[in-house]
A protein has these predicted regions:
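Mobile "lid/hinge" segments at catalytic clefts and subdomain interfaces of large enzymes
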Residues: 87-104, 115, 119, 136, ...
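Short beta-strand-to-loop capping motifs
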Residues: 50-52, 107-112, 236-240, 330-332
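Acidic/polar, glycine-rich intrinsically disordered N-terminal extensions of enzymes
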Residues: 7-13, 17-31, 39-42, 77, ...
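Polar, glycine-rich mid-to-C-terminal structural blocks
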Residues: 105-109, 125-127, 138
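Short amphipathic C-terminal alpha-helix that caps PH/PH-like domains
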Residues: 67, 127, 249-257, 347
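Extended, well-folded interaction surfaces typified by the phenylalanyl-tRNA synthetase beta subunit core
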Residues: 2-13, 19-40, 44-47, 51-104, ...
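Short, conserved charged micro-motifs
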Residues: 22, 56-59, 113-123, 243-248, ...
Length: 358
């Protein structure tokens, strides 16, 4: 299971700004009830193993959001607030055979911290989160890979094109231009992930209005879009082969930035098949849970108020309840919810497994 290490100061910052008091001892006692294993919880650090079915907990920022609901009973917000933006991302039809899923989002007004220590911790957390998502959802960047850019250093609209391997740009943390062929053969990230582009004679790049390469997914970003502690406006790209994985990665990175005061904006996307969409979609997903299934597997009848409190602790909302079904709203980024049994598990955890008599 992936392990994350989070500064208690970050959790305190993101919990207290919503009016809740962070208590490390109480956290250590109760957070495992969410379905996690704590390796270490002291005054400075929380080291925690995240179960594979909860990739939405893989950063200190998204974990803090869950802590507010689960530990402090904060009202859940399963809908993600996304303003309609004007930025355009246009995908060439050639990408259909190379890397067909391309998504994007903008986040503005991010404040990474009041001190260098806070800002440095923010950059480290953002980088760590990307790599954790590449492993957990991206399956080593095959299903999904993420690029995060300083939006002020590039000029929209952006295009995603297929180019030959003699195309040059300066990759992240390098001083000189390299060709795509050189990157795949010589750059550490190229060596690690070149196999994902085996068999292609053209390669995906994202370029801005001035033809500068932002990204060569799933390998490396361009150096000129590097995010720093001073970055306040971000462009996120996610590309891959699996739409659900890409969508979850996009939303989770955007949510991480939102925790620092950022406002998420949608991108007008022209896909490789020519359709036009405004993404990401922050609307929660409505689920039906048969009452017979809930009562049968939990072994007792929960009152409506108990169900409402339980699902709120897990980030969802009870919408209605009739003779047959319970209707729930769950966040779109809860990638793990595929079946009514997954909803049942959330209710059981939110209610308290120790309170259920089977």
């Amino acid at each position: 299971m992936p392990t994350i290490s989070v500064d208690q100061a970050l959790i305190d910052r993101l919990v207290s700004k919503h009016g809740y008091q962070h208590d490390t001892e109480y956290l250590a006692e109760n957070l495992p009830l969410l379905g996690t294993d704590i390796d270490k919880c002291d005054a400075e650090t929380l080291d925690i193993e995240i179960f594979p079915n909860r990739p939405d907990l893989l950063s200190g920022e998204t974990l803090s959001r869950a802590i507010r609901n689960f530990i402090h009973n904060a009202p859940a917000t399963p809908n993600l607030d996304i303003k309609q933006g004007k930025l355009e991302l246009i995908v060439d039809s050639e990408l259909k055979e190379i890397r067909p899923v391309v998504l994007g989002a903008v986040v503005r007004g991010v404040n990474s911290g009041a001190s260098k220590m806070e800002s440095d911790a923010f950059i480290k957390s953002l980088m760590d989160h990307q790599e954790k998502l590449h492993f957990a959802l991206g399956r080593g960047r095959k299903r999904a890979s993420i690029g995060v850019h300083d939006l002020t250093k590039i000029k929209p609209p952006f295009s995603v094109k297929a180019v030959t391997n003699d195309t040059h740009f300066t990759p992240l943390s390098m001083d000189n231009e390299m060709s795509i062929k050189q990157i795949l053969l010589e750059h550490p990230k190229g060596i690690d992930y070149a196999h994902l582009l085996d068999g292609f004679d053209k390669y995906p790049v994202i370029v801005d209005a001035e033809s500068r390469i932002l990204s060569f997914p799933p390998i490396i970003n361009g150096d000129h879009t590097t995010v720093t502690a001073d970055t306040t406006e971000f462009f996120i790209d996610v590309t891959g082969w699996d739409y659900r994985s890409c969508e979850a990665c996009l939303m989770l990175i955007a949510m991480q930035l939102e925790e620092y005061g950022g406002t998420i904006e949608s991108v007008k996307l022209t896909t490789c098949d020519g359709s036009i969409k405004h993404l990401p979609n922050g609307d929660a997903i409505e689920h039906k849970l048969p009452k017979k299934l809930l009562n049968g597997l939990i072994g007792e009848r929960l009152e409506e108020s108990q169900i409402s409190r339980a699902i709120n602790r897990m980030g969802g909302k009870l919408i209605s309840k009739d003779d047959e079904d319970i209707t729930l709203l769950m966040p779109r980024w809860r990638f793990d919810i595929l079946h009514p049994v997954d909803l049942l598990e959330d209710i059981a955890i939110g209610h308290g497994l120790s309170l259920i008599h089977i």
